[in-house]
Amino acid sequence: DINNVYVNAHNHGIDAIRYLDVLPRHAVRQIHLAGHSEDALGSGLLIDTHDAPVCDAVWALYAHAMQRFGGVPTMIERDDNIPPLAELLGELEIARGIAANTRLERAA
């Protein structure tokens, strides 16, 4: 879950890229994408709620994950605040674009 990696890295002050880089390549069979929320008390704490669009930082982390782990299946999760279908399809197109770019870069 790329959003979970991002949220935990933010909350615990660790490097999300480094976290992904130490995972064994063979262990990653599927990637999940989701959004998160910020703590309502304004503490800066992020919460992996799966109820918001995928943010730019998570898309960037996803691109890194695809470079590292190759063409593993990806799913976009929404557990609450389900948006209109057009918005979900927009996120799907972003994920497909990142995956396609990764395939081209790996083939070069």
Functional labels for PLM-detected ranges:
Residues 1, 48-51, 79-80, 91:
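Acidic side chains
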Residues 3-7, 34-38, 77-81:
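Active-site beta-loop-alpha junctions enriched in small/polar residues
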Residues 1, 31, 74:
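Conserved, mostly hydrophobic/aromatic
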